[in-house]
């Protein structure tokens, strides 16, 4: 029971560090929540025009998921990895420090999956890349990768990891609900095109 609590709290707290907000403030750009979509993720940071800052946010958001999984694996054992992974993405998406208004968790999910079972993470990245090449829509590509992740996890890592991936997929779809509405309406912007509203991040 104590291990479960430790894995959950540790994963959540690491995941809840809002790197996009921290980096934009350190760079003198103000509050990222007042820019673009208001999201704290890398895509919204990119809207500031600072590509390096957006890349740093992407890597740190992915890294915190990987670190949460790695630490729990070493300290508490592999059986607690799915718990820590889910909690890390939960922390990113719903950080207590920001009134539970965070990002969409794509980068943190990928970092979590890469650390928990790297073939699953690579398969999801590959799915995103292929989908993006075909459809040219970032959010749709992320949703396809999320939807495929439980199957990848079941094949490469087993039922526990498939359950974690399914939970992450459900959470990811929920955080992308505005994107899904725009996709249905045919209003979601394409990669490289101009956008009027939020997409990823």
Curated annotation (Swiss-Prot):
It is an enzyme of class 2 (transferase). It is a multi-pass membrane protein. Belongs to the PlsY family. The lineage of its organism: Bacteria, Pseudomonadati, Pseudomonadota, Alphaproteobacteria, Rhodospirillales. Probably interacts with PlsX. GO terms for cellular component: plasma membrane. It catalyses: an acyl phosphate + sn-glycerol 3-phosphate = a 1-acyl-sn-glycero-3-phosphate + phosphate. Its main location: membrane. SMART domains: G3P_acyltransf. Pfam families: G3P_acyltransf. This is Glycerol-3-phosphate acyltransferase. Pathway: Lipid metabolism; phospholipid metabolism. Its EC number is 2.3.1.275. The chain crosses the membrane at residues 4-24, 55-75, 80-100, 110-130, 152-174. Catalyzes the transfer of an acyl group from acyl-phosphate (acyl-PO(4)) to glycerol-3-phosphate (G3P) to form lysophosphatidic acid (LPA). This enzyme utilizes acyl-phosphate as fatty acyl donor, but not acyl-CoA or acyl-ACP. Keywords: Cell inner membrane, Cell membrane, Lipid biosynthesis, Lipid metabolism, Membrane, Phospholipid biosynthesis, Phospholipid metabolism, Transferase, Transmembrane, Transmembrane helix. GO terms for biological process: phospholipid biosynthetic process. GO terms for molecular function: acyl-phosphate glycerol-3-phosphate acyltransferase activity. It is found in: Cell inner membrane.
């Amino acid at each position: 029971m104590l291990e479960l609590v430790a894995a959950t709290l540790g994963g959540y707290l690491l995941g809840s560090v809002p790197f996009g907000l921290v980096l934009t403030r350190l760079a003198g750009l103000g509050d990222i929540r007042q820019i673009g979509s208001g999201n704290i993720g890398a895509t919204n940071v990119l809207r500031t025009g600072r590509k390096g800052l957006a890349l740093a946010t992407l890597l740190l958001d992915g890294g915190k998921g990987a670190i949460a999984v790695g630490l729990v694996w070493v300290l508490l054992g592999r059986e607690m990895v799915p718990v820590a992974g889910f909690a890390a993405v939960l922390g990113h998406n719903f950080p207590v420090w920001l009134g539970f208004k965070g990002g969409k968790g794509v980068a943190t999910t990928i970092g979590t999956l890469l650390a928990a079972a790297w073939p699953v993470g690579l398969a999801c990245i590959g799915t995103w890349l292929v989908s993006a090449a075909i459809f040219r829509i970032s959010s749709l590509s992320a949703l396809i990768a999320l939807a495929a992740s439980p199957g990848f996890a079941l094949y490469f890592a087993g039922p526990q990891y498939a359950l974690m991936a399914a939970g992450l997929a459900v959470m990811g779809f929920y955080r992308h609900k505005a994107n899904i509405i725009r996709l249905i309406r045919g209003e979601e912007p394409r990669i490289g095109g101009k956008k009027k509203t939020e997409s990823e991040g």
